[in-house]
């Protein structure tokens, strides 16, 4: 028996796929655990089984800047496809800066899960682009060079032949 915070689970839980666990047990894993890897895995599964909970809890993790940039990226990836606008609005409302790792993941996730046609139909898409540009400008030259190919792909995917292009 392994104990992590107040949630206890058998080693057999680790041997079983999370897909086999009931929603209630997955929620319990998220609510009562401090192991970010276990929480992330449970959240990924909940994004299929209980979308409403996953979105609500994922937003909470992102707003509170929970754990580290890797965890935030995993949570973002899990919930972005559930409700793009709500998740992007959450990112806009964050009071903390976005770590480079997380920023690159946001761009990558948007490229993968948001066709251009869908993106331009999002009500606040110009605000999201401005927000991303603002954060991009905060990175130093080495960090910008680290993501040069990603920025090119992002601009191509979202047809950014506007002032955004000159800034990126």
PLM regions with names:
Residues 2-18, 28-31, 37-51, 60, ...:
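Structural detector for internal amphipathic alpha-helices that build alpha-solenoid repeat scaffolds
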Residues 17-30, 51-63, 84-95, 116-133, ...:
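Amphipathic alpha-helical scaffolding segments comprising HEAT/armadillo-like alpha-solenoid repeats
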């Amino acid at each position: 028996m392994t104990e992590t915070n107040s949630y206890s689970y058998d080693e057999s839980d680790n041997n079983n796929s999370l897909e086999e666990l009931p929603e209630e047990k997955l929620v319990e894993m998220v609510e009562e655990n401090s192991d970010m890897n276990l929480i992330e895995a449970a959240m990924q599964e909940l994004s299929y089984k209980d979308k409403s909970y996953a979105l609500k809890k994922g937003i909470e993790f992102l707003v509170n800047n929970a754990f580290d940039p890797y965890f935030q990226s995993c949570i973002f990836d899990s919930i972005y496809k559930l409700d793009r606008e709500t998740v992007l609005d959450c990112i806009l409302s964050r009071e903390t800066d976005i770590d480079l790792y997380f920023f690159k993941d946001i761009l990558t996730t948007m490229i993968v899960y948001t066709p251009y046609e869908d993106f331009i139909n999002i009500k606040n898409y110009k605000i999201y682009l401005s927000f991303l540009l603002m954060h991009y400008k905060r990175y130093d030259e080495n960090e910008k060079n680290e993501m040069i190919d990603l920025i090119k792909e992002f601009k191509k995917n979202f047809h950014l032949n506007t002032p955004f292009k000159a800034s990126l």
